[in-house]
Each structure stands twice: as C-alpha cells, then as structure tokens.
Amino acid sequence: PREILEMPPYGCVNVHASLLPKYRGAAPIQWAVIEGEKVSGVTTMRMDEGLDTGDMIMKEEVVLDPKETGGSLFEKLSRIGAALCVKTLAAIEAGTAVYTPQDHSQATKVGLIHKQFGLIDWKKPAREIECLIRGLNPWPSAYTKLHGKTLKIWDADVADGDSQKEAGAVAEVTRDAVFVQTGEGLLKLKEVQLEGKRRMACDAFLRGYSLKDTDQLGE
C-alpha cells in the first residue's frame, strides 16, 4: 500500500536482478539465461505500488559467459547487487541520487519457474534446449525420460549436423557423448543424471548404461 511505501523518509528501495524494465517479476536470473541473453545486470529502484515498476536509481551490467548457468549468474548478481545497494543508499543519503522513470513500453514480465517447466520438448531447436538446460541449472534442472526413468541433463552443447531422425531420437552414441536430434540440429549431452543415480559425465554414464542409436528420449 502507498501509505507503507511513504512511511520511510526516503521511501523504499528494492534491488532487482535484471536490467529493468526487462524481466520484471519472478526468476529474472534464470529467465535471462533461458532466453539466451548476452548481457544481464542489477537495477536499484524506488518502490511504487506496481511490480518492479518504480523509478530506477542505479544499474550495473554484466556480460554472460557462453556457458553461464542460472546458478553462476545468481552468484555474480548477488555480489553486484550487494555493492550496488550500498552505493544507492549512500547516494540517497547524500541527496545525489537520480531517479529515472522506466520506459513501460519496453517492459517484459516473467513468472515463477516450476519443476515441470524443466521437461524438455525435443521439437524445439537445439539452441533453445541448451539455454534451458543452463538456465535451470542447478534448480529445478532440465530433464527428459529414458526408458521410463527421469534423466536430468546438466550440461550439453549444440552440435553440428542433422540426423534427419525424429525429434528426441538418439542420433549417435560415442565413447564420451550422446547426440540427440532436436527440432533443429543436434544436441550433444555432456553431463547427465539418471533417476536414482548420481550426477556424472556422459562417458561415465555410458560405461554403466547401454544406450543405442535406436533409442528415443522423452519416453
């Protein structure tokens, strides 16, 4: 309520883990990775009655690594956010803070991520699936089904080529990797975790599990 927000002499300040007005709402860190963003960051703002709609005070950007995960970006933005909060409060106290209204026409909103969101749709392009895997690492994790059991996929790369097989089909099995056909291109699985087992590199997984190029993921 407005009366609560107006109680403190300097108003209320919030730290949001995105470059507002993009990614308002819940789980902005994971969504930035899932959406394949190259840059993310932290914004401090003066709170108003909307959801992440208040005037911006300070921003700091960070360039995402090609293999950035939701977990690694969380760690980066946590450190940046803590320092930016201190700087913001100091500027407010000194009377030097600048309040910049958000361009609401450029706003994007994201929602909560639930465990079921991690179920991989193999009809999607390999690049989208690879981003999903990174964004949901470590929680709730991306997963598929293999012979009726849950198979979590912790790390994967987009691979060259196309097997022309059905989406989700195992296209090739090598000594240390599994190549899966997607709706667009191949995905190379590098680290997996079968239901009831520990997380392991694909070469270790293949030493204990017989996977053939006639198998289908998602079943």
Language-model segments: which ranges?
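Donor/substrate-binding cores of folate-linked one-carbon enzymes
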Residues: 1-109, 114-116
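An anion-binding loop in the catalytic cleft
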Residues: 123-219
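A residue-level structural signature of the nucleotidyltransferase/glycosyltransferase Rossmann-like core
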Residues: 12, 54-57, 121, 150, ...
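Generic detector of leucine side chains in alpha-helical contexts
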Residues: 5, 19-20, 51, 64, ...
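Alpha-helix N-cap/helix-start motif
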Residues: 22-26, 122, 198
